[in-house]
């Protein structure tokens, strides 16, 4: 056998056919060497969502957000990106607040490491500036939720924004940026350069607890994929 590799992003399964293929012919530059301690099964449990979550955590670290900086909020916390972000942040020693619209996921989020859970309803309306609450944030939702998070950021805080589950609009003002020195850092996982990809996957091996792989995955056969795809949609 040849070298073990993994592939996420670059439009595969989106602009390029073959999402469920057992073999693929792709550009070598798209591939990442399988990091030591990872295998194909674990890599696909992590998937694009987990990889994106790791990039978000790295973005907060790059902005100087440390566990002692204060609480970090994760929106859309019960989704793939959000749940992995909660797990990673908890493992790294951060105090994590998880925002979820589904009460049925609260126990699951606590198991992953959320210190407290907030209802999505609390993020429906916002003012230009609100009480400072968060040192950092991972936002997967966008729209009013992201606007609320920005208004609640501590001075010098950073929001890693990677999703638009709630919409692509951003009804905010410049106030958090010019009065509180808040950083809004976009995070894209599709076109991430090779060096950053390799670093993120190596971090995932180190920073994701083994328990995550059993808590966050349901294994099915290939023939079951269409039925499960319908359920997800």
Model-derived segments and spans:
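N-terminal Rossmann-like NAD(P) cofactor-binding module of classical short-chain dehydrogenase/reductase
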Residues: 6, 135-138, 160
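NAD(P)H dinucleotide-binding glycine-rich loop of Rossmann-like/cofactor-binding domains
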Residues: 7-73
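Short glycine-/small-residue-rich Rossmann-like dinucleotide-binding loops
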Residues: 10, 122, 141-142, 163-164
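Glycine-rich phosphate-binding loop and adjacent beta-alpha segment
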Residues: 15, 144-211
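Mid-domain Rossmann-like dinucleotide-binding core that forms the NAD(H)/NADP(H) cofactor-binding site
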Residues: 47-120
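Short amphipathic alpha-helix with an adjacent loop that forms part of the alpha/beta core around
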Residues: 123-133
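C-terminal hydrophobic helical "lid"/dimerization subdomain
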Residues: 195-233
């Amino acid at each position: 056998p040849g070298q073990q590799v993994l592939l996420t992003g670059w439009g595969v399964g989106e602009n390029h056919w073959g999402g469920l293929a057992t073999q693929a012919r792709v550009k070598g530059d798209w591939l990442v060497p399988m990091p030591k301690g990872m295998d194909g099964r674990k890599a696909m449990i992590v998937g694009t969502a987990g990889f994106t979550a790791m990039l978000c955590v790295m973005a907060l670290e790059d902005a100087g957000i440390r566990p002692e900086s204060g609480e970090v909020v994760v929106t859309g916390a019960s989704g793939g990106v959000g749940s992995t972000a909660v797990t990673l942040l908890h493992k790294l020693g951060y105090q994590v607040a998880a925002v979820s619209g589904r009460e049925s996921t609260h126990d699951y989020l606590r198991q992953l490491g959320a210190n407290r859970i907030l209802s999505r309803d609390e993020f429906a309306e916002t003012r230009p500036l609100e009480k400072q609450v968060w040192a950092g944030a991972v936002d997967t939702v966008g729209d009013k939720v992201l606007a609320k998070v920005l208004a609640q950021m501590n001075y010098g805080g950073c929001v890693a924004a990677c999703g638009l589950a709630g919409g692509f609009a951003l009804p905010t003002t410049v106030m958090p940026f010019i009065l509180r020195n808040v950083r809004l850092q976009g995070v894209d996982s599709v076109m991430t350069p090779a060096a950053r990809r390799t670093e993120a996957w190596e971090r995932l091996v180190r920073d994701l607890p083994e328990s995550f792989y059993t808590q966050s995955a349901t294994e099915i056969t290939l023939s079951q994929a269409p039925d499960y795809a319908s359920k997800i949609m």
